[in-house]
Regions:
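Acidic, low-complexity intrinsically disordered tails
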Residues: 113, 148-166
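P-loop NTPase catalytic core
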Residues: 1-147
């Protein structure tokens, strides 16, 4: 009832664990939703779904990018690509040789999920108000979100508030 689609292309890119998020599935999601809502956070599955939607949209947009290039995408679609890259590199990628990133608690995963999703949602709103995509994707908070996975458990709450306020 669970399938983890191992992906040699991800392994070749040194993305570990090399599990393809689009080909993998679990038939236990309904049961897991109850558990995550009760034990981690009420919005866990909602955040997960937002990330999965972005990853699926990225896969569709990659086909366009391969044919006509990234410049053919609208700023909103380019932002989706950047958000999906953040999900892949900052949330899904794990460095098993790093002292802190070897293991990530569910609390920390939830915080990371919230940061990535919040950045995307706030950026979409800013784009709608006329903000520059280039400025949005080069904001220092992007790097802080990327480094959040290296924050030690005892400093999570303080660092989360700091990054979220950026």
């Amino acid at each position: 009832k669970v399938f983890w689609g191992l992906d040699s292309a991800l392994a070749y890119k040194r993305h570990f664990p090399a599990i393809n998020w689009l080909n993998s599935y679990s038939l236990y999601l309904d049961d897991m939703e109850k558990w995550f809502n009760g034990n981690v956070a009420e919005d866990w599955m909602e955040g997960r779904q937002k990330m999965m939607t972005l990853l699926q949209e990225e896969a569709e947009l990659e086909e366009i990018v391969k044919m006509v290039g990234m410049d053919a995408l609208s700023p909103t679609d380019r932002l989706k690509m950047e958000a999906a890259r953040s999900i892949r590199e900052d949330f899904l990628h794990q460095n098993s040789f790093h002292e802190v990133d070897t293991y990530t608690s569910l609390k920390k995963q939830h915080m990371m999920m919230r940061l990535v999703n919040a950045f995307y949602e706030r950026s979409v709103a800013a784009l709608g108000e006329g903000a520059s995509l280039r400025k949005l994707i080069s904001m220092p908070v992007r790097e802080q979100i990327g480094r959040f996975k290296y924050v030690k458990e005892e400093a999570l709450n303080e660092e989360f508030v700091k990054v979220d306020e950026e």
